């Protein structure tokens, strides 16, 4: 999967990311990856479920879900663990 078929979830409203995912599929992508970390993980799950159940109901399915942990440096030089998720949506064949 190329980097252009990745949607990074942040603090914007959920529907902004839903539109980004739908746009990727309409431009011909076979798979779209939704990535988030920390507090944005629940928003990423919401995006995947809205796309899968409301907009592209018969066309898209969850192919893979990866979870993990990243160590991020803090301002005082220490590191903190942050949870990550990647949800791969694939067009049904």
Swiss-Prot record:
Acetylated. Acetylation at Lys-11 decreases DNA-binding affinity. Transmembrane segments: none annotated. It is found in: Cytoplasm; Chromosome. One of its GO terms (cellular component) is cytoplasm. The keyword Cytoplasm applies. GO terms for molecular function: double-stranded DNA binding; RNA binding. It comes from the Archaea. The modification N6-acetyllysine is found at residue 11. Belongs to the histone-like Alba family. NCBIfam families: DNA-binding protein Alba, PRK04015.1. This is DNA/RNA-binding protein Alba. It comes from Pyrococcus horikoshii (strain ATCC 700860 / DSM 12428 / JCM 9974 / NBRC 100139 / OT-3).
